[in-house]
Amino acid sequence: MKKKVLVGMSGGVDSSVAAYLLKEQGYEVIGVTMQIWQDDEEFIEKEGGCCSLSAVADARRVANKIGIPFYVMNFKDAFKRNVIDYFVDEYMEGRTPNPCIACNKFIKFSSFLDKAMAMGIDYVATGHYAIIEKHNDRYIIKKSEDDKKDQTYALYNLTQFQLERTLMPCGQYKKSKIREIAKEIGLRVHNKKDSEEICFIPDNDHGRYIKNRFPNKVREGNFVDKQGSILGTHKGIVYYTIGQRKGLGIAFGKPMYVVDINPFRNEVVLGDLEDLLNTELIAKDTNYIPFDTLKEPMEVEAKIRYSQTPSKAIITPIEDGRVRVNFHEKQRAITKGQSVVFYKDDLLIGGGIIEK
């Protein structure tokens, strides 16, 4: 009997080709677009993004073309609770969230997988660029064939339970080949551009988005230097992130950067580039893929943002499942709330959320 797989289809080229590849490999494929858009004008404005109504139309058209059933499933409440509310709360606390990592952790590989299992379906699949393999008794994640498109940074939270039930067929290919396959089989989405912004924010202006939702909570405050001297007025801490230089709305005669955010005092601390450089961080909420827990110091390559090349570091376990990360070289703008992710060559070791 054919194994069944529920493919999350965003209307983009990657998930479309993932569905096609799995069908070619002999799976019984069912396409699903997750309805995560909220009942407000933000999502109407956002038409064309991976959460929009036009994305549903694209996904349905692809499903018809490759001959698989297609459904829209409602994940609105779970998405609002685990992604949107988390996103807003983090900015309010002076941290910089990563909504894609939260979505992978709580929606795509949790709520979506739960739905598949309740329906008696064997696997879920996505268009992620990553490779899942089984080594001995353990599932591992390796970087994809396409280094530029590799998405392992956002997958460090996956558990053995989830990996055993997840397929990522695009990981074996370069993006150019995925587009080529889409064109060969006549998919109109073959040249659809990649969505790079936050799916639920129409213009990528997260400050405006939060201000519109919670006008009473976003208040003006002071820009200060490291000594606490007032330098000017900011429009609300949710508009800023560590390392930011542009959009401060104030001129200093020299480049100034956001080096800290103090939510309790409603202050944004500005400093020089040198103030952004650091070699150490502490991360919490850690998860490891090739093993359950880190028991002793380990040499890895680590990165503190999605688009960065990993740098050499030593990770050391400390109390409460947290980890200390010591980089060999200074890192620019280590940002609370973002994830630090560890590798050994092309093997994903794990990661955690930067605490300090």
Swiss-Prot record:
Organism: Clostridium botulinum (strain Langeland / NCTC 10281 / Type F)
Disulfide bond entries: 103-199
Membership in a protein family: Belongs to the MnmA/TRMU family.
Site keyed Interaction with tRNA: positions: 128, 338
GO molecular function: ATP binding; tRNA binding; tRNA-uridine 2-sulfurtransferase activity
Subcellular location: Cytoplasm
Keyword Phosphoprotein: no
Listed name of the protein: tRNA-specific 2-thiouridylase MnmA 1
UniProt gene name: mnmA1
Catalytic reaction equation(s): S-sulfanyl-L-cysteinyl-[protein] + uridine(34) in tRNA + AH2 + ATP = 2-thiouridine(34) in tRNA + L-cysteinyl-[protein] + A + AMP + diphosphate + H(+)
